[in-house]
Amino acid sequence: MKNVTGTATSMKRIELSRRSPQYWRVTLNHPPLNVFGPESIPQLNEIVTALETDKEVKVVVFDSAVEGFFLTHYDFLAKIEDTTALPPGPTGLQPLPDMLVRLSRASVVSIASIRGLTRWIEPFGTFCRDGSER
């Protein structure tokens, strides 16, 4: 995205809401389809790091602000260098698998509240307890 001066800006695509010290909600918000891309990685990393270091949080629920879509796929239109240039995470893995492994090891209950299309959910959902109305 570009701002009024034409320079690139970063949109907040993943929003953290601390509902209480023990219960957090993470909302995916990248309309129209909730694609995940290189600009999302630092945002998710910040949240995963907070989950690892906060001793009070017990439950985190991942949901979507985009009606009909939970998480569809990786942004294949982004420059490949924007993803491959990101440094490995603390596990030594590339950023995305690093965060998924760290989420699976975190001492919190992680729930994916799915209300819509889930094309790319397998790697993400595998590391969460899956919750749905259906």
Which residues fall in each region the model found?
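Glycine-rich beta-to-alpha active-site loop
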Residues: 97-134
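Residues that form or flank phosphate/diphosphate-binding pockets in enzymes
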Residues: 35, 71, 121
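Conserved CoA-thioester-binding segment of acyl-CoA-metabolizing enzymes
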Residues: 2-63, 67, 101
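Nucleotide phosphate-binding site architecture
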Residues: 34, 77, 133
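Hydrophobic/aromatic residues within transmembrane alpha-helices
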Residues: 26, 62, 75, 124-127
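Glycine- (often His-adjacent) and acidic-residue-rich active-site loop
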Residues: 64-99
